[in-house]
């Protein structure tokens, strides 16, 4: 959220062997080459012969397009890597480059994305070549034979992503990648796989181009609204009118961001220029894949030059499954609520995060700095570290955690740090109970408990306050047992819908002292001054003042005329970009990039009435003025972007989303629970005594156990927000009793 729920990955410039689906990059390359050689060994028609009729394509043309695609993609990746290394070393990196450094696919994600890039660029090249031969309109994938599509899949490497997946007969713990959670379909919920689609994609050309790509092309008979214009006319409001939420703390917003970073991450392209033409998406407003810039409407309140644009990069494509034709996006993380933001979603990273120097099962901690005697996250060992550039004199690098966005803002870093400390506290206590356990057993048992804690806090404390009691009963009835026919993958639409959290963001980071008074210096730092500022955690008092601020400050209330603050609508990444970004507008552009259907399609999916007229929309929204504004922009409710429509609805009683988002969020979390073999309440995961002990845990108690804070929120930490009324001493909160983890010697 703040940039909460906003994608950002750091680029690792030196890529060693990568794992994806259990195969090293080298193994996958060999398999791909083997597939290509097998194809080349079969007799092929002569090079360059023009097809006699529409529908006949020489396989030689398919192969030459793939080879050309590989050269273009590899060149773009290499140039990008070398350019940013050189600029970071010389200190001349532009703010835009600094930000983009955080958003790259790394390790196994990079391997999976590169294969998909090969495939999509080859199809693009093939279409260009065939267009010069044929005058009639066509979709390139419709004119290729199944055998030729198979050639493309194999020679790109896509066909080999799930080769050789075998699951052990017995498994006590989750895999790091999420692989084998579902024994019948081992890749379901695993990292570096495509999102699931609950409704078919809607692209302008039917398979890849987003609506708004081609000037003049209408959607459902109406012009496509400019995302920035919608943001200006409907989302924008004066910050001094902001309404604080009397029944939600800022921690409610913060848990949403942390949780989102457990569930999904969609990387942006490693190459920041057009593969085919080399146009730079960062500096140019030319629209060529992967650049899909946001156009500026007339009379924009901030950007006066209408020829300018807000930069936007299309999300990385995923290797297609059975349907090679329709573009989908990749989830770099495990879908499951498994604390992957603490432990990682790939094996090499997971090993990197551990302290392997002893048999204590600990996570590695910072060797240079402490926070009042307590551990901080270790620093990442990037050759060129962008966090150093946010405060050149401080020389504080980025942190390393299970999700690469941990340094995005200090509030998020504080939550990562809290869970790191809790893991190490648990591992240490388990060691004293079971002196014979080795480091691996201690690590896995502590990891299992932390994963259960994240599940409990999310489903018991957080989700009821998102959905409200009625939707909670409807979408998340009492847990029965694991069901291996439930698909636990994150839905593409959820990645956009869960950005509802942007409506909760306050424009400041708040820091409070041990009396819950504003902490000097800098008690209220504008959000635009904290992005990527790892130095603020190390040098400005650690995580305690930040956690107090999250507990004792109200979240922003989403109202229909106060949707999102200008700090994220006008000044997002202002310090680190050539132009401040507009997060609500980016959400809308992203839904089009991902081919997500519009508002009414999702209302239909959820069994909700679909308004057709202004009056009907006014009835649904209980706000005719807002309905008129939306219809002015979109022409029809069918075209309203899912995020815009979702956050415009009146909130459900005691919830913080309307009926549509309650359906999408509730449905997703039901699948994540019922389709998880390692769900904490599933029979055989924990003993009955262990489950009873875990039911006592709370986020305030975790804060008590791992910080210098002695007074914390009582009742629900996400609801209480007024000090001292809603606060209690730590001694009144039950601690987790680990007695049932003691093994008989």
Curated annotation (Swiss-Prot):
GO cellular component term, pick one? intracellular membrane-bounded organelle
Task: Report the locations given in the UniProt record.
Answer: Lysosome
Question: What positions does the entry give for heme b binding?
Answer: 260, 408-409, 502
Q: How is the cofactor bound?
A: Binds 1 Ca(2+) ion per monomer. Binds 1 heme b (iron(II)-protoporphyrin IX) group covalently per monomer.
Cysteine sulfenic acid (-SOH): modified positions: 316
Instruction: Report quaternary structure and partners.
Output: Homodimer; disulfide-linked. Each monomer consists of a light and a heavy chain. Found in a complex with CP and LTF; interacts directly with CP, which protects CP antioxidant properties by MPO.
User: Which medical condition is this protein associated with?
Assistant: Myeloperoxidase deficiency: A disorder characterized by decreased myeloperoxidase activity in neutrophils and monocytes that results in disseminated candidiasis.
Listed name of the protein: Myeloperoxidase
Tell me the organism's taxonomic lineage. Eukaryota, Metazoa, Chordata, Craniata, Vertebrata
